[in-house]
Amino acid sequence: MPRKGPAPKRPLHADPVYSSPLVTQLVNKVLVDGKRSLAERIVYAALEGCRDKTGTDPVVTLKRALDNVKPTLEVRSRRVGGATYQVPIEVRAGRSTTLALRWLVTYSRQRREKTMVERLMNELLDASNGLGASVKKREDTHKMAESNKAFAHYRW
């Protein structure tokens, strides 16, 4: 651990189109090999597709999708006396948003649609409706935490 304390969090600037820091975070998650303009094109096209399909503000759709994907509990490994236990722990707000965005992008990359724009758009729409692989991942994470509730007293 550094002696000067934890590194300060850099401020996240809102994106120029939707004025939302969430969209900036999504662009950063889609970003590969530093190709920011390509990532922005993908995200903006996916959000426009969401607007066309639902007729609502795409940032609202993104927030609804994130609310359906954000985990409240996760398990962390804790070694006690030679045995490793999966200890359920509450997830901080920032981490839950980061995990939700990571899962959305990861599972949209695994989808079968032809372009990344279609994959991301359909994963966002599915997640906002409570469907999709990213929502299933959250449910699996909660199920894992629920089944290991007996080890909650090992929390740190």
Swiss-Prot record:
SUPFAM superfamilies: Ribosomal protein S7 (SSF47973). Belongs to the universal ribosomal protein uS7 family. The keyword Ribosomal protein applies. One of its GO terms (biological process) is translation. Keywords: Ribonucleoprotein, Ribosomal protein, RNA-binding, rRNA-binding, tRNA-binding. CDD domains: uS7_Bacteria. One of the primary rRNA binding proteins, it binds directly to 16S rRNA where it nucleates assembly of the head domain of the 30S subunit. Is located at the subunit interface close to the decoding center, probably blocks exit of the E-site tRNA. It comes from Saccharopolyspora erythraea (strain ATCC 11635 / DSM 40517 / JCM 4748 / NBRC 13426 / NCIMB 8594 / NRRL 2338). HAMAP family: Ribosomal_uS7_B. One of its GO terms (cellular component) is small ribosomal subunit. GO terms for molecular function: rRNA binding; structural constituent of ribosome; tRNA binding. This is Small ribosomal subunit protein uS7. Gene3D superfamilies: Ribosomal protein S7 domain. The keyword Lyase does not apply. Part of the 30S ribosomal subunit. Contacts proteins S9 and S11.
